[in-house]
Each structure stands twice: as C-alpha cells, then as structure tokens.
Design a protein with these regions (language model features):
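Bacterial N-terminal signal peptides that target proteins for export
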Residues: 1-9, 19-20
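Exported/periplasmic ABC-transporter solute-binding proteins
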Residues: 25-49, 55-58, 62, 66-70, ...
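C-terminal segment of classical bacterial N-terminal signal peptides
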Residues: 14-22
Length: 242
C-alpha cells in the first residue's frame, strides 16, 4: 500500500502545482511616478512567490485619475496621495482603499554639498518642482515654501509633469536644485546630496491604494503590500502607516 500511497500524494501535489500555474494572472497596476521603482522591485519577489505578474503603468497621480475616470483597464491604483483614491471610491470606480506608504520629501542638489533650509531661502536660480495640481509631491513642495514664507517667484521654476520628471530636471543639470521624492534619492544612492525636508513642513503624503477590479491576483498583491512588502517599502525610503 505504501508505494500506491506515494503515487497518490505525488499526483495530488503535481495537480496542485499545475492548478496554481493556471490560476496565475497578470495584475494591471497604475502607480504614481514616485513609487514606480519600488513596485517594480516588490513585483519581482511577488511574482517569484505567487506566479502572478505585474503590468505597470506610471504617471502623475492626477494623470492616472483622469485615465481611470475614462475607463482605463487597470486592476489596482497606487496613488501618491489619499484624496485621489477617496474621490475615485466615491465615484464608484473602486473599493477597499488602503494606505501602503507615507511619502517623504527631499531637496536635492546634484553633486552636493547637501542643501538645507538656508539654501532654499537664499536660492535665486532654477528650482525643479512637480506640478502641484496633479502631483502630491509638488503640492507638498509648495506647502513647504508656504510654511517657510518663501515666495516661489524668487526662483526660476521648472515644473515637472510628475515627480519623475522633476528628478530628471536635476539629474540632467537643467535645474541645480529640486524637490524630489526621498525614495528616489534612496534608490539612486544620493541621500548625502539632499536635505530631508522636515515632515511638519507639509501635510502628510499618505499614499493609498484602491482596488479597481477584484480578483484573486489583485487580492494577493494587496495582501503582499500590507505584509511582506512593507519591509521593502521602508527600505525604499518611505515611512510606514501606523
């Protein structure tokens, strides 16, 4: 009987693995520009563990809102704020809203020395900033200037469509100074060239997710972001939700 039992168990295991492979699916993720690199890294481990793959589309939060409102076929929205997912949820576009990270703002001067508040106050040159109307990190940057009672007109502002483009402005030398996502600085190993803007200078950048289309693969990814993925999110330069 033992050989027969072994064959039966082996057959059940093989069937389970085969079923898992068939059920593996692709999750279409709309992600805010600041979180693109992080979700790509998380996605590799998630795929290795679950078999589910990610199809990632990245843009400014406001741009993604417009796309989702017009029926873009995404399964999950990872926003750079809380207001946009909340608005979409009220409009009946999604459900199961959750906070996955708290964003942090940085002021970057490529090549250093690291800037600080005094640098920002005396600066008269180019300053890169994301569009405050569509990019939450841009809104946080403008809130920082308001908090410090600095008139933005003292700078030559270069406005990026999203925080990724703002990074490019500084990285290419088009702007000597720029507000960027701290996570992007961590990813590039550039934190020594930047100032971590104090969190009380701007409203919390509470980054929320919204399920747009329910399914097993989407549920698995959400669970991963709330669980094993939190370590990677913290390592990427974000604060974690309480």
């Amino acid at each position: 009987m033992k050989p027969l039992l072994s064959v039966v168990i082996a057959g059940v295991c093989a069937a389970t693995l085969h079923t898992g492979a068939v059920q593996a699916d692709e999750v279409k993720v709309a992600v805010a520009a600041n979180f693109k690199g992080t979700i790509e890294r998380i996605g590799k481990e998630f795929t290795a563990k679950t078999g589910h793959t990610l199809a990632i589309s990245s843009a400014a939060t406001g741009v993604l809102y417009t796309q989702i409102s017009h029926g873009a076929p995404f399964d999950l929205f990872l926003s750079a704020d809380a207001a946009t997912p909340e608005k979409l949820e009220k409009e009946g576009k999604g459900s199961d809203r959750f906070t996955y990270a708290i964003g942090q703002l940085g002021l970057w001067k490529k090549g250093g020395p690291a800037p600080d508040e005094a640098t920002l106050r005396r600066w008269k040159g180019n300053l890169a900033i994301a569009n405050a109307r569509t990019a939450p990190y841009g809104a946080a940057a403008m809130a920082t200037l308001t908090h410090l009672k600095i008139d933005p007109k003292q700078y030559r502002l270069l406005t990026g469509a999203n925080i990724g483009q703002t990074w490019q402005f500084v990285d290419t030398g088009n702007a000597e100074l720029g507000f960027v996502a701290w996570a992007n600085l961590v990813e590039a190993g550039k934190t020594a060239e930047a100032w971590a803007v104090p969190a009380d200078f701007y409203p919390p950048i509470e980054q929320q997710g919204l399920v747009l289309k329910k399914g097993a693969a989407v549920e698995a990814l959400v669970a991963w972001l709330k669980g094993p993925g939190q370590a990677q999110i913290k390592a990427a330069g974000y604060a974690l939700p309480q």
